[in-house]
């Protein structure tokens, strides 16, 4: 039996609407995405396999919302919105349901043409749509999963996502077909800090941290500056950004 047939048959036996349900299960096992009580938004959710898994993981205390242009048959405990996520009206409906999301997930894929470069470009476009939606909906420290077909534009997409999250990794779940070029960008820890890695700026050192680094505040955000002393006002380059604090080095 092929891997495709195995997951297809398992989905039928276990009541999942698509074999893709196992992709989300494996992504969650690898990256600890959805926890009890989480609010989850699934983009391009039809027919609902990912919604079923997200609902299991978030539990009764969680909130799960699926968005798609196609109708999604009802799933107990899951809200659905029929619409285009790029339109303001659809986003407003979702925000009214969830406020802020803990996790945004997307298994969206383009209609395949068989032309590799075109299919890749369209998949990157859909992944960017998911990324932009996540920036709008995610709570601080929230997570994103977005599917993309591997190709020449994948690295640029990853770099853009990486700038807005604590870290990004790519995962090819076992449930994906062997012949598929699909991979999933898994971005953890939505950053809301006023600085990003690589930024240069002038700061004022107010005091010293426990490890002896200078401490500066940027719009209330704590930046630790190695080798700086209280009273200094150096120009620095940001070297690492965490949800609640970051690190920088002085420029010569």
From Swiss-Prot:
One of its GO terms (cellular component) is cytoplasm. Its EC number is 2.1.1.166. Specifically methylates the uridine in position 2552 of 23S rRNA at the 2'-O position of the ribose in the fully assembled 50S ribosomal subunit. S-adenosyl-L-methionine binds at residues 48, 50, 68, 84, 107. Keywords: Cytoplasm, Methyltransferase, rRNA processing, S-adenosyl-L-methionine, Transferase. Belongs to the class I-like SAM-binding methyltransferase superfamily. RNA methyltransferase RlmE family. GO terms for molecular function: rRNA (uridine-2'-O-)-methyltransferase activity. It is an enzyme of class 2 (transferase). The active site is at residue 147. It comes from Natronomonas pharaonis (strain ATCC 35678 / DSM 2160 / CIP 103997 / JCM 8858 / NBRC 14720 / NCIMB 2260 / Gabara). It is found in: Cytoplasm. The keyword Transmembrane helix does not apply. Pfam families: FtsJ (PF01728), TRAM (PF01938). This is Ribosomal RNA large subunit methyltransferase E. HAMAP family: RNA_methyltr_E (MF_01547). Residues 194-252 form the TRAM domain. It catalyses: uridine(2552) in 23S rRNA + S-adenosyl-L-methionine = 2'-O-methyluridine(2552) in 23S rRNA + S-adenosyl-L-homocysteine + H(+). The keyword Metal-binding does not apply. The gene is rlmE.
């Amino acid at each position: 039996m092929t891997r495709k047939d195995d997951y297809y048959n398992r989905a039928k036996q276990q009541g999942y609407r698509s074999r893709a349900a196992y992709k989300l299960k494996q992504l969650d096992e690898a990256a600890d995405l959805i926890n009890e009580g989480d609010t989850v938004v699934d983009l391009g959710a039809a027919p609902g396999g990912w919604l079923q898994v997200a609902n299991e993981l978030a539990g009764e205390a969680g909130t799960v919302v699926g968005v798609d242009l196609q109708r999604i048959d009802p799933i107990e405990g899951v809200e659905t919105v029929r619409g285009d996520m790029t339109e303001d009206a659809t986003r407003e409906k979702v925000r009214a349901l969830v406020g802020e999301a803990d996790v945004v997930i997307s298994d969206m894929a383009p209609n395949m043409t068989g032309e590799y470069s075109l299919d890749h470009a369209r998949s990157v476009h859909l992944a960017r749509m998911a990324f932009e939606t996540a920036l709008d909906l995610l709570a601080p420290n929230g997570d994103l999963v977005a599917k993309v077909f591997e190709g020449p534009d994948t690295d640029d997409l990853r770099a853009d996502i990486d700038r807005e999250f604590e870290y990004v990794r790519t995962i090819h779940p076992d449930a994906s077909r062997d012949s598929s070029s699909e991979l999933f960008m898994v971005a953890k820890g939505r950053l809301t800090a006023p600085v990003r890695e690589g930024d240069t700026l002038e700061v004022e050192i107010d005091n010293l941290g426990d490890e002896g680094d200078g401490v500066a505040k940027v719009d209330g955000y704590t930046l630790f500056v190695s080798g700086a002393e209280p009273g200094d006002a150096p120009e620095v380059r940001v070297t690492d950004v965490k949800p609640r604090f970051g690190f920088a080095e002085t420029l010569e």
